[in-house]
């Protein structure tokens, strides 16, 4: 979406956002670990609401509550329903690659939504330790598969890299010249680059620190360094590879129009065939998005716990699981 709506120059601003985001993520993770506390179950809990309360003082707890309200609501949409929609969308694209005449999208989406909800429920109701055990296995696997696939496309089209980087740096400041007039505003390029950068690495949102606060690491500075690496890996590596794959592959990018996940599948298909590209994207995106769903479930649960106490965690998780089905069956757009 960022590349098609903002042009190649969005990658430049994505990198700028990542550099700023590394410092932001470092700060918020450090504060989360420094000002965390134990809940009634003996688990570490932390995040913006806790370093507001424990760092600024209890008179500022109201600000932490406001943060929690918005974060818990965002978890249901951005961290849950949108991700479920991405999963079913990528799988539907893969199904069409193998069976172009397939017409049961609504039924497929409902079935996939129910399956995802059941899988999420099994993990979530197993507690924080099971959540960590699942995500620590999913993330490396999905990253390796996706990185290798993108690198293969980029190396296969290495001769186009000079032109691609020219378009990225020129398009960052004069988008009209590299998008055929489809994207004429530099502000639009900056906007899409920064929005997608923040959406991918969560730097400054205050959400990721809640996960970091659960660590057994006692030194805040050491844990905060992982926050820097997160932004680097997620945005500088993963997002950059996605953008370069699209730009190097030679596929037709309709600038100024919202792009679909099928574009990445099409780009990978230039080397791995259409079926192979669709399959890689379906698997990689399913793992990416599902781990995101699990992570945001923790964020929302922690926010409800801060406001209402531990008794609110389970009801929120039930609503969260049901929202997965909604996201899979209703057409939502970020």
Over which residues does each language-model region extend?
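Flexible loop linkers connecting adjacent transmembrane helices
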Residues: 1-10, 23-58, 252-272, 298-307
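Transmembrane helix-boundary motif of multi-pass solute transporters/channels
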Residues: 1-17, 208, 215, 222-223, ...
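Select transmembrane alpha-helical segments in multipass membrane proteins
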Residues: 12-13, 58-74, 112-115, 145, ...
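Helix-loop-helix module between adjacent transmembrane segments
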Residues: 20-42, 48-49, 53-85, 92-123, ...
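Extracellular/periplasmic helix-exit of transmembrane alpha-helices
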Residues: 28-35, 40, 150-167, 178-181, ...
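Hydrophobic, small-residue-rich membrane helices and short re-entrant helix-turn-helix hairpins
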Residues: 48, 123-140, 160-165, 196, ...
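Membrane-interface loop-to-helix entry segments
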Residues: 84-91, 107-169, 304-305, 334
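A generic transmembrane alpha-helix motif of multi-pass inner-membrane proteins
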Residues: 311-334
């Amino acid at each position: 979406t960022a590349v098609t709506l903002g042009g190649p120059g969005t990658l430049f601003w994505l990198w700028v956002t990542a550099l700023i985001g590394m410092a932001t993520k470092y700060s918020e993770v450090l504060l989360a670990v420094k000002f965390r506390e134990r809940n009634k179950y003996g688990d570490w809990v932390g995040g913006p609401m806790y370093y507001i309360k424990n760092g600024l003082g209890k008179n500022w707890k109201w600000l932490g509550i406001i943060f929690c309200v918005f974060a818990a609501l965002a978890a249901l949409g951005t961290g849950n329903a949108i991700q479920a929609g991405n999963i079913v969308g990528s799988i539907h694209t893969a199904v069409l690659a193998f069976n172009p005449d397939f017409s049961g999208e609504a039924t497929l989406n409902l079935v996939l939504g129910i399956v995802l909800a059941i899988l999420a429920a099994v993990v979530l109701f197993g507690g924080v330790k099971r959540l960590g055990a699942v995500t620590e296995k999913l993330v490396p696997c999905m990253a390796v598969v996706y990185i290798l696939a993108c690198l293969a496309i980029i190396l296969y089209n290495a001769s186009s890299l000079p032109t691609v980087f020219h378009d990225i740096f020129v398009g960052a400041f004069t988008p009209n010249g590299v998008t055929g007039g489809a994207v004429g505003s530099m502000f639009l390029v900056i906007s899409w680059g920064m929005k997608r950068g923040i959406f991918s690495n969560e730097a400054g949102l205050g959400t990721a620190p809640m996960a970091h606060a659960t660590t057994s690491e006692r030194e805040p500075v050491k844990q905060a360094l992982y926050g820097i690496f997160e932004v680097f890996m997620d945005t500088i590596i993963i997002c950059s590879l996605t953008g370069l794959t699209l730009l190097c592959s030679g596929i037709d990018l309709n600038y100024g129009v919202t792009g679909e996940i099928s574009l990445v599948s099409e780009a990978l298909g230039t080397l791995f065939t259409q079926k192979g590209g669709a399959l890689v994207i379906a698997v990689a995106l399913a793992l990416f998005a599902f781990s995101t769903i699990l992570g945001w479930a923790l964020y929302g649960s922690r926010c409800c716990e801060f406001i209402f106490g531990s008794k609110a965690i389970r009801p929120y998780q039930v609503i969260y699981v049901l929202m997965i089905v909604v996201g899979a069956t209703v057409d939502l757009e970020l």
